[in-house]
């Protein structure tokens, strides 16, 4: 088993804290049209592409956010697992970025452009069933899937890619 450095542990803790703070701040943003919710903290789901410390950081941050906001057990468990699955998928795309000289607009490698897809997919697949279970509205799963997808595209895709563009400033992420 690989030993975890103090730097990795500190990075994971900082990401967890930032995810939690951003999630709590996002709870004050009213849902657009009553359906779409934008959890700004989801922009951080791009971070496993840059550091493996983000995987536990995001998972713990999501778990803490859900605990603090009083999420129901289904959301607490499956929402946190969706974040973990997305983080692992994003980290897996790191290899795609390392093994190709192909860069796309903004000078970012292909893997960085694809990095938002795992959390978008994980949340779009898992969360509609959680919302349907909690709301007791199973017939609304397609609507819930669409609303989660839109929120994830904006936060993971849009904001996450803006965050990824900061990779040109390695002092922000360090080197791992």
Regions found by a protein language model. Name each.
Residues 24-35, 43, 63-176:
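Membrane-embedded alpha-helical hairpins and interfacial helices in multi-pass inner-membrane proteins
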Residues 58-62:
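Extracytosolic (periplasmic/ER-lumenal) interhelical loops and adjacent juxtamembrane/interface segments
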Residues 1-56:
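Hydrophobic transmembrane alpha-helices
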């Amino acid at each position: 088993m690989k030993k975890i450095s103090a730097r990795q542990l500190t990075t994971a803790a900082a990401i967890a804290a930032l995810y939690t703070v951003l999630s709590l701040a996002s709870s004050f943003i009213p849902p657009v049209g009553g359906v779409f919710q934008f959890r700004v903290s989801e922009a951080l789901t791009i971070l496993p592409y840059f550091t493996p410390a983000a995987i536990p950081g995001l998972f713990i941050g999501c778990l803490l956010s859900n605990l603090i906001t009083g999420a129901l057990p289904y959301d607490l468990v499956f929402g946190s697992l969706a974040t973990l699955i997305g983080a692992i998928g994003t980290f897996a795309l790191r290899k795609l970025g390392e093994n190709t000289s192909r860069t796309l607009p903004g000078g970012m490698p292909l893997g960085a452009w694809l990095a938002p897809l795992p959390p978008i997919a994980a949340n779009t697949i898992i969360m509609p069933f959680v919302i349907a279970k909690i709301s007791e509205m199973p017939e609304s799963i397609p609507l819930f899937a669409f609303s989660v997808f839109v929120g994830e595209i904006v936060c993971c895709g849009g904001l996450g890619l803006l965050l990824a563009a900061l990779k040109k400033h390695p002092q922000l992420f360090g080197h791992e």
